[in-house]
Amino acid sequence: IRDYRGGGRSSGRETIGRVAAGAIASKILNELGISLCAYTKAIGPYVINETEYNYSEISQNSLYMPNNNIAEQAGQYITSLMKETNSCGGVIECIADGLPVGLGEPVFDKLDALLAQAVMSIGAVKGVEIGDGFQAASSVGSKNNDPFYVENGEVHKKTNHSGGTLGGMSDGSRLIVRAAVKPTSSIAIPQETINTAHENTEIVIHGRHDPVI
């Protein structure tokens, strides 16, 4: 049964099971010395650069952004979209510290691939980045490669453009994953569509729908 009022498999409400399972998984991982942190990096045109991060401010605003000033601007933007019955997208970033080296398989079950599959299975997610992601496409090898060095007998990286994975496996550095979320498709602005008789028509969606997921 598909409830036309919302709440079906394509609804954002489907994520409640993932949230519950994720909360439990986070506690288990914490016992293993692995810490997770996820937050909103961007809402519409309001993007927080890494140099502007303040992780202590994440829980201080309702948008879960690591910068209260930008969160306030993004909130005003969302309010304006609500008045226009429109919507916007955003970017979620997740970081994991304390991962052991070697998680993932080198071919079909690469850590990158498994993460991308899991994140892309979330409704409205249209893109996934690991590390520098799409920015790496405009870089050059000499800058994108992460230099290694040894300190006190341990191997480290000077940079982390790869986002914590190499050759499909975790390399012990911080894992960085981003998800691009499209604007909510259920809006009250008239849109062109077709009906069951294959006729051109318009649709206006009413009900409880969010201006951003």
Regions found by a protein language model. Name each.
Residues 1-8, 191-212:
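Short acidic, glycine/tyrosine-flanked loop/strand segments centered on an H-E-D-like triad
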Residues 18, 24, 176-179, 213:
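Active-site scaffold segments
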Residues 85-88, 92-202:
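Glycine-rich anion/phosphate-binding loop at the beta-strand->alpha-helix junction
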Residues 2-107:
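Glycine-rich, mobile lid/loop segments that gate access to catalytic sites or pores
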Residues 64-73, 137, 162, 205-213:
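Unusually extended, aromatic-enriched hydrophobic runs near protein termini
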